[in-house]
């Protein structure tokens, strides 16, 4: 059986986050909204492309979001979404 036929597992190291992902995302969201952008579109653009130009410097949002790996941001968003779906 080739390696393409097997499911790969992705493991995140269980270590405390230096930067609170939720706080960063909320700060970035607020900064985008204050500048008149659609926050969801801009954050998705950043997550898909990795291009920090989607995030403004306002409120230091660009610097904050770049301190967190994109895969960590996506992991937190997926966890939050799925936990909300299970409760609702």
Curated annotation (Swiss-Prot):
Domain of life, per the record? Bacteria
The disulfide bonds in this chain are none
What Pfam families does UniProt report for this protein, alphabetically? IreB
- Give the record's family classification: Belongs to the UPF0297 family.
Organism name = Geobacillus thermodenitrificans (strain NG80-2)
Residue spans making up a coiled coil are none
- Any idea what this protein is called? UPF0297 protein GTNG_2488
């Amino acid at each position: 059986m080739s390696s393409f036929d097997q499911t790969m597992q992705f493991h995140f190291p269980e270590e405390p986050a230096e930067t609170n992902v939720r706080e960063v995302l909320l700060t970035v969201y607020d900064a985008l909204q204050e500048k008149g952008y659609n926050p969801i579109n801009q954050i998705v653009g950043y997550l898909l492309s990795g291009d920090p130009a989607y995030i403004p410097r306002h409120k230091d949002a660009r610097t904050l979001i770049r301190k967190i790996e994109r895969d960590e941001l996506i992991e937190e968003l997926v966890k939050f979404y799925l936990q909300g779906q299970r409760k609702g």
